[in-house]
UniProtKB/Swiss-Prot annotation:
Protein name from the UniProt record: HPr kinase/phosphorylase
UniProt similarity note: Belongs to the HPrK/P family.
Species whose genome carries this gene: Bordetella petrii (strain ATCC BAA-461 / DSM 12804 / CCUG 43448)
InterPro entries membership: HPr(Ser)_kin/Pase, Hpr_kin/Pase_C, Hpr_kin/Pase_Hpr_N, P-loop_NTPase, Ser_kin/Pase_Hpr-like_N_sf
Keyword Transferase: yes
EC number: 2.7.11.-, 2.7.4.-
Keywords tagged on the record: ATP-binding, Kinase, Magnesium, Metal-binding, Multifunctional enzyme, Nucleotide-binding, Serine/threonine-protein kinase, Transferase
Broad EC category: transferase
The gene coding this protein: hprK
Domain notes: The Walker A ATP-binding motif also binds Pi and PPi.
Alphabetized NCBIfam families for the sequence: hpr-ser
Length: 308
């Protein structure tokens, strides 16, 4: 759960806040209740009292048109409705009755010189990331040819060795072992590394490797958007892999389907080359190029011509 104080501290560089009233409510929670980030903050709206209310010049002018009795009535309804905080944009100064009511109801009242529209945009982006659904996945997250690739598989299959080979070929490491994913938008999943494991890769027999120190600054990435999952499996006689799958394999991640390829681990197989090929093929599919579909059309055309 996010508090008002955390919001103020996290945005101190971009949004300088001045705390005016409601100092005792610094730990007041900003409840999302499954709402989108766009619904959590906006211009003054009495119909939606549970969101962060922003006063710009127009809102304050509208508020000031009412007499004290009506202002008190409307603000009481708003403050009782569970508003997390009231923000005054454009460097505006609040009327004394608004300060008194925020102190009375212990609701944070803050001001900032940032323009109202810009303030709302910045906070929506921040809240969208901060309150996004998250999960932690065991695997190695890489930047391969500009695509976010999650390498998964049971322990001992060589995920870290494969990552090391990809790094040596010029690709980048995002996270090893524990990858934190957040769904920051309806069709966008972003992955990053926990601070404790930043730049580290654990390889059996070698221990922990500081990839940034060994390979340089360009060998690591802060975050990437997940586009492909490469799942490693042991090659056994019992396994029967479909050589030409007609349907793309996907895996659900935070309620969103993500493309998935399965690679068998066997002696003599160059997995790094296979991963690169899988990424290139995924890029083609994202551009609307379906190699298998084109082959099947070509095959159907050949059969049709041979039957004449």
């Amino acid at each position: 759960m996010l508090t008002v104080q955390e919001l103020v501290d996290d945005n101190a560089d971009n949004i300088p806040f001045n705390w005016i009233a409601g100092h005792g409510a610094a730990e007041r929670n900003i409840r999302d209740d499954g709402m989108a980030a766009a619904d959590l903050v906006g211009h003054l709206n009495l119909i939606h009292p549970s969101r962060i209310q922003v006063f710009g010049q127009e809102e304050l002018a509208y508020y000031s048109r009412f007499d004290l009795r009506r202002r008190t009535h409307h603000m009481d309804e708003l403050l009782i409705g569970g508003v997390p905080a009231i923000l005054l944009a454009d460097g505006l100064s609040p009327p004394q009755d608004l300060i008194d009511q925020c102190d009375q109801h212990q609701v944070p009242l803050l001001s900032t010189p940032v323009a109202a529209a810009q303030l709302i945009d910045l906070l929506r982006i921040y809240l969208g990331k901060k309150l996004a659904p998250t999960t932690t996945v065991h695997g190695v997250f890489m930047d391969v040819l500009g695509l976010g690739v999650l390498i998964t598989g049971e322990s001992g299959l060589g995920k870290s060795e494969l990552a090391l080979e990809l790094i040596s070929r010029g690709h980048g490491l995002v996270a090893d072992d524990a990858v934190e994913f957040s769904r920051i938008a309806p069709g966008m999943i972003e992955g990053h590394c926990p601070p404790l494991l930043q730049n580290m890769l654990e390889v059996r027999g070698l221990g922990l490797l500081d990839i940034r120190t060994i390979f340089g600054e360009t060998s690591v990435r802060r975050k990437m958007r997940l586009k492909l999952i490469v799942h490693l499996v042991r090659a056994t006689a019992q396994d029967k892999f479909e050589r030409l799958p007609l349907q793309d394999i996907t895996q659900d991640m935070l309620g969103m389907p993500v493309r998935k390829v399965m690679l068998q681990v066997a002696a003599g197989r160059n997995l790094a080359v296979l991963v690169e090929a899988a990424v290139r093929n995924t890029i083609l599919k994202l551009r609307g190029i379906d190699t298998l579909g084109e082959f099947m059309e070509r095959q159907a055309m050949a059969i049709l011509q041979s039957s004449k």
